[in-house]
């Protein structure tokens, strides 16, 4: 844990609830002795396709080999799954590549489910689930045809406890449900221009029981322990300073880590960090060439309103920061991986707020033309800043004992405090320009009038447009009917595509 070694900076503090935290939800995976490195590398090879700095999983080793219990009955279902939604625009290459990765050790096939919507190219009617080892979460990849890429944590709930668990996790995450059905709901965790992190609950059918995972624990960063603990259904027990252990209604073990208030940086601190930015080596995101070629198309889709930004305003990627990244040269060296310790890790809290240049992912540099790539492209992504961590101490998940070695593989990287940059405001058209654009003949008079519905036009005994000939009115009515049919068709299409995310 991190002690508050610095004095409070002037300028106030920012609550954890007011900012987006990509590490709000993370997972501990406890492997048998000698297997942690293999399992960690297998997970990293998957997440690098979305972003390499998202160290949301940490695999550690237990001290003694645990005896394997006999498999549960067919009516049981592992309680935790991780689903990666990958963009179709990047091509089928990545889907096929990742599916081949699942065919190799340490991955093991678990089961297949029927899914809705458009399906994966290699399995036209089914969705395959895989696992790394006994007692670890299920994994699946899903191809999506619109929106952004998604990392989703899913808890499978018993039929009886679904409603209660939804209320419980809403208290812990402190975010409202974004999508909700009778047997499914999604909580937004983090969102930026490239990908989303989500937490979801899915209710199993009657008679099917979720099996809590013995080798995996979910960890949530919470703020007000005093208010939260009395509201939880089961007893909470402290395992270290600022960390508590409890269970949900289905018996899933979860860890709660206190996220303290984050002090704002002084202006001098920001200037000092900005002066060092150009000299820092930026880590690189591995991305195949197909992802690079489709990147512009994906951005265009998002800009046309097909992606709903949730979890707060999209101020985590100010335009000024984009300009900073564009001014940097392409690094000649690959990023070095964070050094991991073999102990069970702890997400550190922070005594000071990281710089505004900490986490948001940058867009591709404009000078990197597509025709210059002969090998798989690299996409620039700013390094998560760990320079400001002080006094990091690691604690064992089971014993709560403090450990001497520190593990900085997972750090809290918060979004910038600043709102939309002035550069963005300057690039937008002024009100005067918009007013001039509305002075086009034949447009100004209709701008303030509300459009009549098709039913109103059809049932109106007098002409809706008195100055329009009868033949022209028939043409207008026909045009409205066509628009109504198109709108209805688009609505049905969106409902079908929504099924892609129902898994």
From Swiss-Prot:
Annotated Polar residues bias:
436-445
Q: Which domain of life is it from?
A: Eukaryota
Task: Cite the record's Low complexity compositional bias ranges.
Answer: 447-460
Where is the stretch described as Disordered? 434-470
**Which family, according to UniProt?**
Belongs to the FAM124 family.
The protein in question is named Protein FAM124A
Question: Which gene holds the coding sequence for this protein?
Answer: fam124a
């Amino acid at each position: 844990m991190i002690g508050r070694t610095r004095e409070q900076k002037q300028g106030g503090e920012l609550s954890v609830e007011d900012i987006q935290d990509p590490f709000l939800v993370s997972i501990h995976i406890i492997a048998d002795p000698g297997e942690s490195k293999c399992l960690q590398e297998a997970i990293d090879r998957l997440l690098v396709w979305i972003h390499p700095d998202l160290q949301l999983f940490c695999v550690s080793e237990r001290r003694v080999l645990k005896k394997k219990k006999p498999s549960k009955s067919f009516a049981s279902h592992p309680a935790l799954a991780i689903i990666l939604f990958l963009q179709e625009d990047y091509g089928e290459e990545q889907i096929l590549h990742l599916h081949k990765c699942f065919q190799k050790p340490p991955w093991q096939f678990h089961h297949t489910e029927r899914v809705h919507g458009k399906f994966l190219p290699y399995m036209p009617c089914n969705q395959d689930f895989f696992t790394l080892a006994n007692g670890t979460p299920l994994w699946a990849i899903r191809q999506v045809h619109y929106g952004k890429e998604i990392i989703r944590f899913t808890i499978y709930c018993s039929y009886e406890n679904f409603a209660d668990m939804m209320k419980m996790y809403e208290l812990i995450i402190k975010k409202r449900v974004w999508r909700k059905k009778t047997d499914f709901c999604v909580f937004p965790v983090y969102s930026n221009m490239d990908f989303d992190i989500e937490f979801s609950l899915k209710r199993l059918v009657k008679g099917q029981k979720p099996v809590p995972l013995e080798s995996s624990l979910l960890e949530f960063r919470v703020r007000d322990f005093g208010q939260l603990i009395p509201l939880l259904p089961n007893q909470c027990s402290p395992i270290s300073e600022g960390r508590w252990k409890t269970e949900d209604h289905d018996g899933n073990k979860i860890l709660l880590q206190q996220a303290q208030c984050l002090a704002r940086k002084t202006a001098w601190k920001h200037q000092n960090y900005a002066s060092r930015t150009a000299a820092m080596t930026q880590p690189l995101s591995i991305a195949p060439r197909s992802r690079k070629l489709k990147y512009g198309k994906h951005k265009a889709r998002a800009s046309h309103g097909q992606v709903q930004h949730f979890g707060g305003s999209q101020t985590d990627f100010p335009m000024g920061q984009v300009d900073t990244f564009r001014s940097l040269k392409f690094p000649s060296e690959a990023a070095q991986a964070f050094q991991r310790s073999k102990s069970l890790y702890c997400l550190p809290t922070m005594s000071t707020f990281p710089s505004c240049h900490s986490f948001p992912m940058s867009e591709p540099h404009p000078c990197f033309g597509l025709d210059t790539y002969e090998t798989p492209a690299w996409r620039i992504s700013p390094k998560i800043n760990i320079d400001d961590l002080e006094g990091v101490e690691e604690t064992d998940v089971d014993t709560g004992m403090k450990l001497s070695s520190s593990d900085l593989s997972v750090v809290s990287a918060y979004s910038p405090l600043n709102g939309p940059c002035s550069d963005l405001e300057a690039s937008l058209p002024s009100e005067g320009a918009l007013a001039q654009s509305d002075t086009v003949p034949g447009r100004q008079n209709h701008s303030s009038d509300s459009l009549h519905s098709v039913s109103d036009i059809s049932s109106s005994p007098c002409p809706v447009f008195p100055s329009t000939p009868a033949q022209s009115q028939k043409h207008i009515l026909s045009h409205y009917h066509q628009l109504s049919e198109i709108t209805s068709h688009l609505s049905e299409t969106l409902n079908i595509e929504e099924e892609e995310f129902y898994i």
